[in-house]
Amino acid sequence: MSKNIRIGYAGFISFGSRILSLFTGLIFITIVTRNLSQYDFGLWQLILSIVSYAVLPNVVIDYWILRNLARGERNATTAVLFSLMLSGGGLIMYLMISAFSAPKVGGQFLFFIVAMAQVPLSYLSITLQTISQAARPQAVGVAFMVFETAKVIVAIFAFLVFKISLNVAISAVLVALVAQCAVLLAMQPRYLYMRSFSVSAVKGWLKVAWLPAFATFAGYIGTIDSLIMTAITASTIVLANYRAANVIAAMISHAGAFAFALYPKLIGGAAIENESRYVMTLTMMFSIPMSAGIFVLAVPLLSILGSGYANAYMVLWIAIPVVAIGSVHQIFEAVLTGHERIDLSKNPSFRDYSKSRLFTVPSITLYGSIISLVALGITTYWLNSIHASAVTMAVAWAAIVICVSSPGLIIKWSMMKKSGTVFRMPWKNMAVYGLASAIMVAVLIAAGALDIKKVSTIDLVFKLLEYLALASAVYFVIIFSMDRTFRAIAFRSIDIARGVLRRSN
Protein backbone atom coordinates (compact mmCIF):
# COMPACT_ATOMS: atom_id res chain seq x y z
CA MET A 1 0.00 0.00 0.00
CA SER A 2 2.96 2.35 0.55
CA LYS A 3 3.65 2.32 -3.19
CA ASN A 4 0.53 4.48 -3.60
CA ILE A 5 1.87 7.17 -1.27
CA ARG A 6 2.51 10.46 -3.05
CA ILE A 7 5.50 11.88 -1.23
CA GLY A 8 5.07 15.43 -2.49
CA TYR A 9 1.36 15.55 -1.70
CA ALA A 10 1.72 13.95 1.72
CA GLY A 11 4.75 16.11 2.45
CA PHE A 12 3.06 19.40 1.59
CA ILE A 13 -0.06 18.49 3.57
CA SER A 14 2.09 17.62 6.55
CA PHE A 15 4.35 20.65 6.14
CA GLY A 16 1.41 23.01 5.63
CA SER A 17 -0.35 21.75 8.74
CA ARG A 18 2.85 22.13 10.75
CA ILE A 19 3.32 25.69 9.54
CA LEU A 20 -0.25 26.52 10.52
CA SER A 21 0.34 24.86 13.86
CA LEU A 22 3.37 27.11 14.38
CA PHE A 23 1.02 29.98 15.08
CA THR A 24 -1.21 27.98 17.42
CA GLY A 25 1.85 26.47 19.07
CA LEU A 26 3.43 29.89 19.51
CA ILE A 27 0.22 31.21 21.06
CA PHE A 28 0.09 28.28 23.47
CA ILE A 29 3.72 28.37 24.53
CA THR A 30 3.55 32.16 24.91
CA ILE A 31 0.49 31.96 27.16
CA VAL A 32 2.15 29.26 29.24
CA THR A 33 5.65 30.75 29.53
CA ARG A 34 4.38 34.24 30.32
CA ASN A 35 2.13 32.92 33.09
CA LEU A 36 4.44 30.30 34.57
CA SER A 37 7.65 30.96 36.43
CA GLN A 38 10.87 29.67 34.89
CA TYR A 39 10.86 27.05 37.64
CA ASP A 40 7.39 25.76 36.70
CA PHE A 41 8.17 25.85 32.98
CA GLY A 42 11.32 23.82 33.56
CA LEU A 43 9.36 21.41 35.77
CA TRP A 44 6.81 20.95 32.98
CA GLN A 45 9.59 20.17 30.50
CA LEU A 46 10.98 17.62 32.96
CA ILE A 47 7.58 15.90 33.23
CA LEU A 48 7.29 15.77 29.43
CA SER A 49 10.73 14.18 29.27
CA ILE A 50 9.71 11.50 31.77
CA VAL A 51 6.56 10.74 29.75
CA SER A 52 8.75 10.25 26.69
CA TYR A 53 10.79 7.66 28.61
CA ALA A 54 7.63 5.87 29.74
CA VAL A 55 6.40 5.29 26.18
CA LEU A 56 9.62 3.54 25.15
CA PRO A 57 8.14 -0.01 25.35
CA ASN A 58 5.67 0.92 22.61
CA VAL A 59 8.46 0.99 20.05
CA VAL A 60 8.31 -2.82 19.87
CA ILE A 61 4.95 -2.42 18.13
CA ASP A 62 5.48 0.77 16.15
CA TYR A 63 8.80 -0.28 14.64
CA TRP A 64 7.45 -3.48 13.10
CA ILE A 65 3.87 -2.43 12.33
CA LEU A 66 5.20 0.35 10.09
CA ARG A 67 7.34 -2.07 8.11
CA ASN A 68 4.52 -4.67 8.00
CA LEU A 69 1.81 -2.28 6.84
CA ALA A 70 4.11 -0.66 4.28
CA ARG A 71 4.45 -4.10 2.67
CA GLY A 72 0.69 -4.77 2.60
CA GLU A 73 -0.02 -6.64 5.86
CA ARG A 74 -3.13 -5.83 7.94
CA ASN A 75 -2.29 -5.95 11.65
CA ALA A 76 -3.54 -2.52 12.74
CA THR A 77 -6.12 -3.91 15.19
CA THR A 78 -3.49 -6.06 16.88
CA ALA A 79 -1.11 -3.10 17.10
CA VAL A 80 -3.65 -0.82 18.80
CA LEU A 81 -4.82 -3.41 21.34
CA PHE A 82 -1.31 -4.58 22.22
CA SER A 83 -0.21 -0.95 22.59
CA LEU A 84 -2.90 -0.32 25.20
CA MET A 85 -1.76 -3.45 27.06
CA LEU A 86 1.83 -2.23 27.14
CA SER A 87 0.76 1.18 28.48
CA GLY A 88 0.29 -0.45 31.91
CA GLY A 89 4.01 -1.12 32.08
CA GLY A 90 4.62 2.41 30.86
CA LEU A 91 2.67 3.80 33.82
CA ILE A 92 4.84 1.84 36.24
CA MET A 93 7.98 3.17 34.57
CA TYR A 94 6.61 6.74 34.74
CA LEU A 95 5.90 6.46 38.47
CA MET A 96 9.35 5.04 39.20
CA ILE A 97 11.19 7.83 37.36
CA SER A 98 8.89 10.47 38.88
CA ALA A 99 9.57 9.15 42.39
CA PHE A 100 13.29 9.71 41.77
CA SER A 101 12.95 13.10 40.04
CA ALA A 102 10.29 14.88 42.13
CA PRO A 103 12.39 15.25 45.32
CA LYS A 104 15.19 16.81 43.25
CA VAL A 105 12.93 19.69 42.16
CA GLY A 106 11.02 20.52 45.32
CA GLY A 107 8.83 17.45 45.80
CA GLN A 108 5.96 18.65 43.58
CA PHE A 109 4.35 15.18 43.38
CA LEU A 110 0.87 16.50 42.52
CA PHE A 111 1.94 17.68 39.07
CA PHE A 112 3.54 14.32 38.30
CA ILE A 113 0.31 12.52 39.31
CA VAL A 114 -1.90 14.78 37.18
CA ALA A 115 0.28 14.05 34.14
CA MET A 116 -0.06 10.26 34.54
CA ALA A 117 -2.97 10.08 32.10
CA GLN A 118 -0.66 11.33 29.37
CA VAL A 119 1.13 7.96 29.32
CA PRO A 120 -1.66 5.68 27.95
CA LEU A 121 -2.88 8.46 25.66
CA SER A 122 0.63 8.84 24.27
CA TYR A 123 0.84 5.10 23.64
CA LEU A 124 -2.38 5.19 21.63
CA SER A 125 -1.49 8.39 19.78
CA ILE A 126 1.95 7.18 18.71
CA THR A 127 0.62 3.85 17.44
CA LEU A 128 -2.16 5.53 15.46
CA GLN A 129 0.37 7.93 13.95
CA THR A 130 2.56 4.99 12.91
CA ILE A 131 -0.38 3.23 11.25
CA SER A 132 -1.27 6.42 9.39
CA GLN A 133 2.34 6.97 8.32
CA ALA A 134 2.34 3.59 6.57
CA ALA A 135 -0.95 4.11 4.71
CA ARG A 136 -2.00 7.76 4.72
CA PRO A 137 0.85 10.02 5.96
CA GLN A 138 -1.07 13.26 5.44
CA ALA A 139 -3.46 12.23 8.24
CA VAL A 140 -0.64 12.68 10.74
CA GLY A 141 -0.21 16.29 9.64
CA VAL A 142 -3.91 17.05 9.97
CA ALA A 143 -4.06 15.42 13.41
CA PHE A 144 -1.02 17.42 14.50
CA MET A 145 -2.80 20.64 13.59
CA VAL A 146 -5.84 19.55 15.61
CA PHE A 147 -3.56 18.69 18.54
CA GLU A 148 -2.01 22.15 18.54
CA THR A 149 -5.36 23.91 18.09
CA ALA A 150 -6.95 22.01 20.97
CA LYS A 151 -4.09 23.03 23.27
CA VAL A 152 -4.63 26.69 22.41
CA ILE A 153 -8.38 26.53 22.98
CA VAL A 154 -7.90 25.05 26.45
CA ALA A 155 -5.16 27.57 27.30
CA ILE A 156 -7.18 30.59 26.14
CA PHE A 157 -10.27 29.37 28.01
CA ALA A 158 -8.21 28.94 31.17
CA PHE A 159 -6.59 32.34 30.69
CA LEU A 160 -10.00 34.04 30.40
CA VAL A 161 -11.76 32.11 33.17
CA PHE A 162 -9.04 31.38 35.72
CA LYS A 163 -5.32 31.76 36.17
CA ILE A 164 -2.91 29.73 34.04
CA SER A 165 -1.09 27.14 36.15
CA LEU A 166 1.08 24.11 35.54
CA ASN A 167 -1.99 21.91 36.01
CA VAL A 168 -3.72 23.81 33.20
CA ALA A 169 -0.74 23.27 30.87
CA ILE A 170 -0.77 19.54 31.63
CA SER A 171 -4.56 19.33 31.15
CA ALA A 172 -4.32 21.13 27.81
CA VAL A 173 -1.95 18.45 26.52
CA LEU A 174 -4.29 15.69 27.71
CA VAL A 175 -7.30 17.20 25.91
CA ALA A 176 -5.20 17.71 22.78
CA LEU A 177 -4.07 14.07 22.80
CA VAL A 178 -7.68 12.87 22.91
CA ALA A 179 -8.56 15.10 19.95
CA GLN A 180 -5.51 13.92 18.02
CA CYS A 181 -6.39 10.24 18.50
CA ALA A 182 -9.97 10.86 17.36
CA VAL A 183 -8.82 12.51 14.12
CA LEU A 184 -6.29 9.77 13.37
CA LEU A 185 -8.91 7.06 13.83
CA ALA A 186 -11.40 8.91 11.63
CA MET A 187 -8.95 9.36 8.75
CA GLN A 188 -7.42 5.89 8.67
CA PRO A 189 -8.56 3.42 5.97
CA ARG A 190 -10.86 0.80 7.48
CA TYR A 191 -9.27 -2.03 5.51
CA LEU A 192 -6.20 -1.80 7.74
CA TYR A 193 -8.21 -3.24 10.64
CA MET A 194 -9.33 -6.85 11.04
CA ARG A 195 -11.83 -8.15 13.61
CA SER A 196 -9.28 -10.32 15.34
CA PHE A 197 -6.21 -10.15 17.53
CA SER A 198 -3.22 -11.85 15.89
CA VAL A 199 -1.21 -13.69 18.53
CA SER A 200 1.26 -14.84 15.89
CA ALA A 201 1.95 -11.24 14.86
CA VAL A 202 2.64 -10.28 18.48
CA LYS A 203 4.96 -13.28 18.90
CA GLY A 204 6.82 -12.22 15.77
CA TRP A 205 7.28 -8.67 17.08
CA LEU A 206 8.41 -9.88 20.50
CA LYS A 207 10.86 -12.36 19.00
CA VAL A 208 12.91 -9.52 17.53
CA ALA A 209 11.90 -6.91 20.10
CA TRP A 210 15.55 -6.35 20.93
CA LEU A 211 16.14 -4.58 17.61
CA PRO A 212 13.56 -1.76 17.97
CA ALA A 213 14.44 -1.61 21.67
CA PHE A 214 18.07 -1.01 20.74
CA ALA A 215 17.19 1.53 18.03
CA THR A 216 14.94 3.46 20.41
CA PHE A 217 17.41 3.26 23.26
CA ALA A 218 20.03 4.69 20.94
CA GLY A 219 17.76 7.61 20.12
CA TYR A 220 16.34 8.25 23.56
CA ILE A 221 19.44 7.91 25.69
CA GLY A 222 20.41 11.38 24.55
CA THR A 223 17.31 12.83 26.22
CA ILE A 224 18.73 11.91 29.61
CA ASP A 225 20.62 15.18 29.26
CA SER A 226 17.68 16.95 30.95
CA LEU A 227 17.97 14.72 34.01
CA ILE A 228 21.76 15.13 34.13
CA MET A 229 21.50 18.90 33.93
CA THR A 230 18.77 19.05 36.60
CA ALA A 231 20.60 16.67 38.94
CA ILE A 232 23.94 18.52 38.75
CA THR A 233 22.57 22.06 39.00
CA ALA A 234 19.63 21.20 41.33
CA SER A 235 17.65 23.72 39.30
CA THR A 236 15.43 23.88 36.21
CA ILE A 237 16.60 27.34 35.07
CA VAL A 238 19.30 26.04 32.69
CA LEU A 239 16.80 23.54 31.31
CA ALA A 240 14.24 26.31 30.80
CA ASN A 241 16.69 28.48 28.81
CA TYR A 242 17.85 25.54 26.70
CA ARG A 243 14.31 24.32 25.99
CA ALA A 244 13.05 27.83 25.22
CA ALA A 245 15.74 28.22 22.55
CA ASN A 246 14.90 24.80 21.15
CA VAL A 247 11.19 25.61 21.03
CA ILE A 248 12.06 28.35 18.53
CA ALA A 249 14.68 26.32 16.66
CA ALA A 250 12.23 23.43 16.34
CA MET A 251 10.32 25.50 13.78
CA ILE A 252 13.02 24.50 11.30
CA SER A 253 12.35 20.81 11.94
CA HIS A 254 8.94 21.19 10.27
CA ALA A 255 10.76 21.18 6.94
CA GLY A 256 11.52 17.55 7.74
CA ALA A 257 7.84 16.80 7.14
CA PHE A 258 8.73 16.03 3.54
CA ALA A 259 10.81 13.05 4.69
CA PHE A 260 7.95 11.62 6.74
CA ALA A 261 6.47 9.63 3.84
CA LEU A 262 9.86 8.61 2.41
CA TYR A 263 10.58 5.75 4.81
CA PRO A 264 7.37 3.71 4.21
CA LYS A 265 7.64 4.47 0.49
CA LEU A 266 11.14 2.97 0.34
CA ILE A 267 10.11 -0.02 2.46
CA GLY A 268 7.38 -0.69 -0.10
CA GLY A 269 9.98 -0.92 -2.87
CA ALA A 270 10.23 2.59 -4.34
CA ALA A 271 13.43 3.62 -6.14
CA ILE A 272 15.89 5.48 -3.92
CA GLU A 273 17.51 8.02 -6.23
CA ASN A 274 14.54 10.04 -7.48
CA GLU A 275 12.47 9.93 -4.28
CA SER A 276 15.31 10.79 -1.90
CA ARG A 277 16.65 13.62 -4.05
CA TYR A 278 13.17 15.14 -4.34
CA VAL A 279 12.65 14.95 -0.58
CA MET A 280 16.07 16.50 0.10
CA THR A 281 15.31 19.33 -2.34
CA LEU A 282 11.99 20.12 -0.67
CA THR A 283 13.54 19.95 2.79
CA MET A 284 16.36 22.34 1.87
CA MET A 285 13.93 24.65 0.06
CA PHE A 286 12.32 25.50 3.38
CA SER A 287 14.91 24.71 6.08
CA ILE A 288 17.58 27.05 4.66
CA PRO A 289 15.45 30.24 4.65
CA MET A 290 13.83 29.31 7.97
CA SER A 291 17.27 28.92 9.55
CA ALA A 292 18.41 32.28 8.18
CA GLY A 293 15.27 34.09 9.30
CA ILE A 294 15.33 32.68 12.83
CA PHE A 295 19.01 33.57 13.18
CA VAL A 296 18.31 37.24 12.38
CA LEU A 297 15.17 37.43 14.53
CA ALA A 298 16.52 35.37 17.44
CA VAL A 299 16.11 37.99 20.19
CA PRO A 300 12.53 39.11 19.37
CA LEU A 301 11.42 35.50 18.88
CA LEU A 302 12.76 34.52 22.30
CA SER A 303 11.24 37.66 23.82
CA ILE A 304 7.79 36.41 22.84
CA LEU A 305 8.27 33.53 25.25
CA GLY A 306 9.18 35.99 27.98
CA SER A 307 11.71 38.77 28.50
CA GLY A 308 13.78 36.43 30.67
CA TYR A 309 14.60 34.25 27.66
CA ALA A 310 15.97 37.01 25.41
CA ASN A 311 19.51 36.45 26.71
CA ALA A 312 19.42 32.87 25.39
CA TYR A 313 19.90 34.07 21.80
CA MET A 314 23.35 32.44 21.57
CA VAL A 315 21.79 29.13 22.59
CA LEU A 316 19.30 29.56 19.74
CA TRP A 317 22.04 30.44 17.24
CA ILE A 318 23.75 27.12 17.96
CA ALA A 319 20.48 25.18 18.08
CA ILE A 320 19.59 26.30 14.53
CA PRO A 321 22.23 24.18 12.71
CA VAL A 322 21.59 21.31 15.14
CA VAL A 323 17.96 21.12 14.02
CA ALA A 324 18.82 21.65 10.35
CA ILE A 325 21.39 18.85 10.49
CA GLY A 326 18.76 16.69 12.17
CA SER A 327 16.52 16.94 9.10
CA VAL A 328 19.34 15.64 6.90
CA HIS A 329 20.01 12.84 9.40
CA GLN A 330 16.37 11.85 9.04
CA ILE A 331 16.62 11.53 5.25
CA PHE A 332 19.89 9.60 5.34
CA GLU A 333 18.48 7.17 7.90
CA ALA A 334 15.30 6.65 5.85
CA VAL A 335 17.40 5.79 2.80
CA LEU A 336 19.75 3.46 4.66
CA THR A 337 17.06 1.52 6.55
CA GLY A 338 14.14 1.83 4.13
CA HIS A 339 15.72 -0.47 1.56
CA GLU A 340 17.02 -2.96 4.11
CA ARG A 341 15.45 -6.38 3.39
CA ILE A 342 16.93 -8.55 6.16
CA ASP A 343 13.51 -8.84 7.87
CA LEU A 344 12.12 -10.50 4.74
CA SER A 345 14.65 -13.33 4.95
CA LYS A 346 13.57 -16.74 6.20
CA ASN A 347 14.43 -17.04 9.92
CA PRO A 348 17.19 -14.38 10.07
CA SER A 349 19.49 -14.84 13.05
CA PHE A 350 20.69 -12.34 15.63
CA ARG A 351 23.98 -12.18 13.76
CA ASP A 352 22.16 -11.39 10.50
CA TYR A 353 20.28 -8.51 12.09
CA SER A 354 23.38 -7.18 13.84
CA LYS A 355 25.14 -6.88 10.48
CA SER A 356 22.21 -5.13 8.81
CA ARG A 357 21.65 -1.39 8.52
CA LEU A 358 18.70 -1.75 10.92
CA PHE A 359 21.36 -2.18 13.61
CA THR A 360 24.38 -0.25 12.37
CA VAL A 361 22.52 3.02 11.69
CA PRO A 362 21.17 3.43 15.26
CA SER A 363 24.60 2.36 16.55
CA ILE A 364 25.98 5.63 15.20
CA THR A 365 23.36 7.55 17.16
CA LEU A 366 24.10 5.55 20.32
CA TYR A 367 27.83 6.25 20.26
CA GLY A 368 27.17 9.93 19.63
CA SER A 369 24.72 10.14 22.53
CA ILE A 370 27.12 8.49 24.96
CA ILE A 371 29.91 10.89 24.00
CA SER A 372 27.50 13.82 24.31
CA LEU A 373 26.24 12.80 27.76
CA VAL A 374 29.73 12.27 29.15
CA ALA A 375 30.89 15.62 27.78
CA LEU A 376 27.76 17.34 29.12
CA GLY A 377 28.17 15.85 32.59
CA ILE A 378 31.84 16.85 32.89
CA THR A 379 31.31 20.33 31.41
CA THR A 380 28.21 21.08 33.50
CA TYR A 381 29.89 19.90 36.71
CA TRP A 382 32.83 22.22 36.05
CA LEU A 383 30.69 25.20 35.05
CA ASN A 384 28.45 24.70 38.07
CA SER A 385 31.49 24.57 40.36
CA ILE A 386 32.66 27.99 39.13
CA HIS A 387 29.11 29.38 39.41
CA ALA A 388 28.66 30.02 35.69
CA SER A 389 25.39 31.60 34.62
CA ALA A 390 22.43 29.53 33.43
CA VAL A 391 22.76 30.92 29.90
CA THR A 392 26.47 30.03 29.78
CA MET A 393 25.71 26.43 30.72
CA ALA A 394 22.90 26.30 28.15
CA VAL A 395 25.28 27.58 25.44
CA ALA A 396 27.84 24.91 26.37
CA TRP A 397 25.07 22.30 26.22
CA ALA A 398 24.06 23.34 22.70
CA ALA A 399 27.70 23.47 21.54
CA ILE A 400 28.30 19.90 22.72
CA VAL A 401 25.25 18.67 20.80
CA ILE A 402 26.33 20.19 17.48
CA CYS A 403 29.92 18.95 17.85
CA VAL A 404 28.66 15.40 18.32
CA SER A 405 25.88 15.34 15.69
CA SER A 406 27.96 16.60 12.76
CA PRO A 407 30.39 13.64 12.46
CA GLY A 408 27.44 11.23 12.47
CA LEU A 409 26.16 12.81 9.28
CA ILE A 410 29.48 12.22 7.55
CA ILE A 411 29.53 8.59 8.67
CA LYS A 412 26.03 7.93 7.28
CA TRP A 413 26.96 9.56 3.98
CA SER A 414 30.00 7.28 3.83
CA MET A 415 27.81 4.24 4.54
CA MET A 416 25.58 5.08 1.58
CA LYS A 417 28.59 5.42 -0.70
CA LYS A 418 30.11 2.12 0.46
CA SER A 419 26.82 0.24 0.04
CA GLY A 420 26.47 1.48 -3.53
CA THR A 421 23.35 3.49 -2.73
CA VAL A 422 22.77 6.12 -5.39
CA PHE A 423 22.06 9.40 -3.62
CA ARG A 424 22.71 12.73 -5.30
CA MET A 425 22.58 15.86 -3.19
CA PRO A 426 20.75 18.75 -4.90
CA TRP A 427 23.74 21.09 -4.63
CA LYS A 428 22.55 23.48 -7.36
CA ASN A 429 19.14 23.84 -5.76
CA MET A 430 20.74 24.38 -2.37
CA ALA A 431 22.99 27.10 -3.80
CA VAL A 432 19.91 28.89 -5.14
CA TYR A 433 18.14 28.61 -1.79
CA GLY A 434 21.25 29.86 0.01
CA LEU A 435 21.58 32.87 -2.29
CA ALA A 436 17.89 33.70 -1.98
CA SER A 437 18.14 33.41 1.81
CA ALA A 438 21.16 35.74 1.90
CA ILE A 439 19.26 38.37 -0.08
CA MET A 440 16.24 37.84 2.17
CA VAL A 441 18.38 38.44 5.27
CA ALA A 442 19.86 41.61 3.76
CA VAL A 443 16.36 42.94 3.09
CA LEU A 444 15.24 42.12 6.64
CA ILE A 445 18.23 43.92 8.15
CA ALA A 446 17.65 46.92 5.89
CA ALA A 447 14.02 46.94 7.06
CA GLY A 448 15.14 47.17 10.70
CA ALA A 449 14.92 43.55 11.85
CA LEU A 450 17.93 44.04 14.14
CA ASP A 451 16.54 47.21 15.70
CA ILE A 452 13.15 46.11 17.02
CA LYS A 453 12.28 48.26 20.02
CA LYS A 454 10.82 46.96 23.26
CA VAL A 455 7.08 46.73 22.75
CA SER A 456 4.18 44.71 24.12
CA THR A 457 3.97 41.03 23.26
CA ILE A 458 1.01 41.54 20.90
CA ASP A 459 2.79 44.35 19.06
CA LEU A 460 5.93 42.24 18.85
CA VAL A 461 4.02 39.32 17.34
CA PHE A 462 2.46 41.54 14.67
CA LYS A 463 5.84 43.11 13.94
CA LEU A 464 7.34 39.66 13.43
CA LEU A 465 4.45 38.70 11.15
CA GLU A 466 5.25 41.74 9.02
CA TYR A 467 8.86 40.60 8.71
CA LEU A 468 7.66 37.08 7.92
CA ALA A 469 5.51 38.37 5.07
CA LEU A 470 8.38 40.48 3.73
CA ALA A 471 10.88 37.62 3.98
CA SER A 472 8.50 35.17 2.28
CA ALA A 473 7.80 37.56 -0.58
CA VAL A 474 11.49 38.21 -1.23
CA TYR A 475 12.55 34.58 -0.95
CA PHE A 476 9.82 32.95 -3.03
CA VAL A 477 10.00 35.54 -5.81
CA ILE A 478 13.73 34.85 -6.15
CA ILE A 479 13.49 31.05 -6.17
CA PHE A 480 10.49 31.18 -8.54
CA SER A 481 12.70 32.93 -11.05
CA MET A 482 15.75 30.71 -10.47
CA ASP A 483 14.56 27.24 -9.40
CA ARG A 484 12.80 24.85 -11.79
CA THR A 485 11.62 22.55 -9.00
CA PHE A 486 9.78 25.33 -7.21
CA ARG A 487 8.17 26.55 -10.44
CA ALA A 488 6.88 23.04 -11.16
CA ILE A 489 5.43 22.83 -7.64
CA ALA A 490 3.83 26.26 -7.95
CA PHE A 491 2.18 25.50 -11.29
CA ARG A 492 1.00 22.10 -10.04
CA SER A 493 -0.52 23.72 -6.95
CA ILE A 494 -2.37 26.23 -9.13
CA ASP A 495 -3.76 23.40 -11.28
CA ILE A 496 -4.95 21.52 -8.18
CA ALA A 497 -6.58 24.68 -6.78
CA ARG A 498 -8.38 25.27 -10.07
CA GLY A 499 -9.64 21.69 -10.07
CA VAL A 500 -10.99 22.05 -6.55
CA LEU A 501 -12.75 25.31 -7.46
CA ARG A 502 -14.33 23.72 -10.55
CA ARG A 503 -15.67 20.80 -8.51
CA SER A 504 -17.05 23.13 -5.85
CA ASN A 505 -18.93 25.11 -8.48
Please provide the spans of the model-predicted regions.
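Signature of the first transmembrane helix
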Residues: N4-V60, L91, L95, V114-Q118, ...
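Alpha-helical transmembrane segments of multi-pass membrane transport and lipid-handling proteins
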Residues: F23-L26, P57-V59, V80-G106, F157-L160, ...
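Helix-loop junctions and terminal segments of transmembrane helices
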Residues: V55-E73, A250-E273, R277-T283, E333-L344
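Hydrophobic alpha-helical transmembrane segments
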Residues: V142-R190, A249, S363-W382, H387-M415, ...
